[in-house]
Amino acid sequence: MNKIRKGDEVIVLTGRDKGKRGTVSLRKDDSYLVIDGINLVKKHVKPNPMKGTTGGIVEKAMPIHQSNVAIFNAATGKADRVGIKVQADGSRVRVFKSSGAEIKAA
């Protein structure tokens, strides 16, 4: 079970975007995340008349390692850690470590 999933709101802990919040839009591999508006780089794209794309400079969100982000707890307004709790029926749910509140699925 992944502790950070697509649709979760996260806050960046390290790097040039430290303190910024964003929503996870994609999980790459097992430990990299693409977050909307975070870790933006400028890519130079060649024009391709076969595909109908024009060339130019495009801003693109690049992956960031999950160890550099933490899930955002809206109740406290701070970054929080994620724990796994086993329910009575055997199912597992994600909870905030600070409060024990269940994290709602996005």
From Swiss-Prot:
GO terms for molecular function: rRNA binding; structural constituent of ribosome. Disulfide bonds: none annotated. One of its GO terms (cellular component) is ribosome. Coiled coil: none annotated. Keywords: Ribonucleoprotein, Ribosomal protein, RNA-binding, rRNA-binding. GO terms for biological process: translation. Pfam families: KOW (PF00467), ribosomal_L24 (PF17136). SUPFAM superfamilies: Translation proteins SH3-like domain. CDD domains: KOW_RPL26. One of two assembly initiator proteins, it binds directly to the 5'-end of the 23S rRNA, where it nucleates assembly of the 50S subunit. One of the proteins that surrounds the polypeptide exit tunnel on the outside of the subunit. Part of the 50S ribosomal subunit. Belongs to the universal ribosomal protein uL24 family. PANTHER family: MITOCHONDRIAL RIBOSOMAL PROTEIN L24 (PTHR12903). This is Large ribosomal subunit protein uL24. The lineage of its organism: Bacteria, Pseudomonadati, Pseudomonadota, Betaproteobacteria, Burkholderiales.
